[in-house]
């Protein structure tokens, strides 16, 4: 993961992909209040652009469904290792916790 993030931070994401929609349930702990969360395009160890905005788990949990291009939904479903979830906060604006998607 680029950058140190929050060394105490922990998180868990469950991602569902349907035709034209990405849904994510997020849980984080041991970090300051989350201010943003996204799915980024990028393999392990690289930083990449935001491709899906998510609800920030500001109280530790969040659930969101975002409409996306069907092609992107297909990509996330077929090649999850090409994407990661990143949760941001004021202390770690580049990302407090990050997790690579996998099946």
Q: Where do the language-model regions lie?
A:
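Metal-centered catalytic cores of metalloenzymes
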Residues: 1-37, 41-103
């Amino acid at each position: 993961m680029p950058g140190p993030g929050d060394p105490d931070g922990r998180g868990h994401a469950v991602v569902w992909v349907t035709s034209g929609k990405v849904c994510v349930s997020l849980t984080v702990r041991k970090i300051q209040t989350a201010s943003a969360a996204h799915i980024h395009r990028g393999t392990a160890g690289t930083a990449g652009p935001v491709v899906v905005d998510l609800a920030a788990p500001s109280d530790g949990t969040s659930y969101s469904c975002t409409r996306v291009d069907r092609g992107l939904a297909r990509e996330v479903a077929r090649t999850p290792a090409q994407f990661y979830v990143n949760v941001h906060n004021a202390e770690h604006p580049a990302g407090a916790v990050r997790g690579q998607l996998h099946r």
